[in-house]
C-alpha cells in the first residue's frame, strides 16, 4: 500500500513538473523579451504580441537548440542571399527519398540581433508587405496573415500564435507606451 502511494505521488509530481515547466519558461521568456518586442513594435509596426508569440513558439520558450546555439528565436532560414553567420539544423526539409535534411538557418550574435533581423525580414519581403496595413492592435489578422503568406508550414500556425497571445495576455503589450516618447518631447 505504502509503495503504491509513493509511486502515485512520484508520478503526480513528475506530471506537475512537466506542466509547470512550459509555464515557467514562458513567463521567463516574456519577462526577458517583452521590452524588446515593444521597441520593435514602435520601430516597425509589428504587434509586440505577435513578436512574443512567434518567439515563444519558434524557440520553444527560448529553450530550442536553434535559440540556444544560434540565437535564432524565429526559425528564419538562410535563403540564397544571406551573407551572415549560419547554423545547420534538421527541421522540415526532405530530399527526394523522404530523408530529413539539415537546413541552413541564420545565426546571430545576440537575441536582440535575432529580433531586429526578423522585423527587417518581414518589412523587406514582398510577401509580407500587406501585413503592415493591418493595425498593431489586430493580432489575429497578423497571425492569419503570417500563415497565409507562408511564414510557417504548420496549418495550425495562426491558431497556435493566437492561443499563446490569449493564454499569456500578450495583447497587453500592444497597448504599451512608446519607450522613446520621452525623448521626443521638446
Residues covered by each model-derived region:
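Catalytic cores of secreted/periplasmic lytic hydrolases that degrade extracellular macromolecules
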Residues: 2, 11, 15-186
